[in-house]
C-alpha cells in the first residue's frame, strides 16, 4: 500500500517536471519580439550602453535593461538603436568602442 502511494507521487512529480521543462516559458521563444528593432536580448550583460551623445559612458543614470543595441548600433536621444554612422553630428574624431562597431 505504501509503495503504491510512493509510486503514484513519484509518477505525478515526474509528469509535473516534464511539463515544466517543456513549457514555452522555459524556452527562448518568448524573447522573440521582446526587444525592439536592432536590439538583442542579453540578461547577463552589465554596464552602460554607448549612445550617440556619449560614446564612452562611465556612469548610467538609469537602470540597464536586458535589451541591448546590436553590434554596430548605439542609442540615440529617443533611446532607439541606430547605426553609429547615422548619429547626428558624429565627427570623424569620435571613436566608439570596437565592440560597438564590430571590428
Swiss-Prot record:
Pfam families: TIL (PF01826). Residues 35-87 form the TIL domain. The keyword Nucleotidyltransferase does not apply. Residues 1-22 form the signal peptide. Keywords: Signal. It comes from the Viruses. Belongs to the polydnaviridae EGF-like motif protein family. This is Probable protease inhibitor Egf0.4b. It comes from Microplitis demolitor bracovirus (isolate Webb) (MdBV).
Amino acid at each position: 500500500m505504501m509503495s503504491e502511494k510512493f509510486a503514484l507521487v513519484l509518477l505525478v512529480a515526474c509528469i509535473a517536471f516534464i511539463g515544466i521543462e517543456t513549457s514555452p516559458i522555459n524556452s527562448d521563444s518568448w524573447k522573440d519580439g521582446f526587444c525592439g528593432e536592432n536590439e538583442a536580448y542579453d540578461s547577463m550583460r552589465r554596464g552602460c550602453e554607448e549612445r550617440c551623445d556619449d560614446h564612452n559612458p562611465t556612469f548610467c543614470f538609469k537602470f540597464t535593461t536586458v535589451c541591448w543595441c546590436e553590434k554596430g548600433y548605439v542609442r540615440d536621444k529617443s533611446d532607439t538603436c541606430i547605426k553609429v554612422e547615422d548619429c547626428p553630428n558624429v565627427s570623424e574624431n569620435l571613436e566608439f568602442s570596437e565592440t560597438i562597431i564590430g571590428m
